[in-house]
Amino acid sequence: MMRKLFKISEIPQWKILGKEVVDEIIFRTIKPRNRLILELMARGGMRIGEVLKLTPADVDDRKLTLREPKSGRGQEVVFIPQKLADRLKEYIREKEIKSEERIFPTTYTAARVMVKKAGFLAGVHLRPHDLRRHAATFASRSGVPIELVSKTSSAMPIFQRPRGISARSAMLRQ
């Protein structure tokens, strides 16, 4: 009886979304704003908070500058595919967003709900970090050097880090 009470539960493995599933989630999203948010997270490996903080001043063609990222560094740079960069610039132009205004003026909670609904439309339980994890996994499987993937994934690739362990804790263990 006591053994059952204090049984150590097994940590379930994360389910990595396939490229086809992520593409379906993105293409089923109708609103351009929501689609851009999803693509920046899935293709650029950005956190939801980083996407919401973006301003037109941070966008330089394919290079996005993240000011005050969660990692604690002063600035970080994210590179996105050219087609996504073109759509982002077009969105900024169409909406006439000033250089210091946020591109996506929505709350963190509203963005999380949008991501969850996008996953529901595709029949997948989706959380914002699932898209970031997909980006890191896809990059590493595509032959991007592990050091580069690590820099965009909070210092350690997700597939090398035990679940529930932060990047900082994982680095201290090495």
Where are these regions (language model features)?
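Short, polar N-cap/turn motifs at the start of nucleic acid-interacting alpha helices
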Residues: 59-61, 125, 144-165
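Short, basic (Lys/Arg/His-rich) helix/loop patches that form interaction surfaces
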Residues: 27, 97-101, 112-151
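N-terminal DNA-binding recognition helix of tyrosine site-specific recombinases/integrases
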Residues: 1-5, 45-49, 114
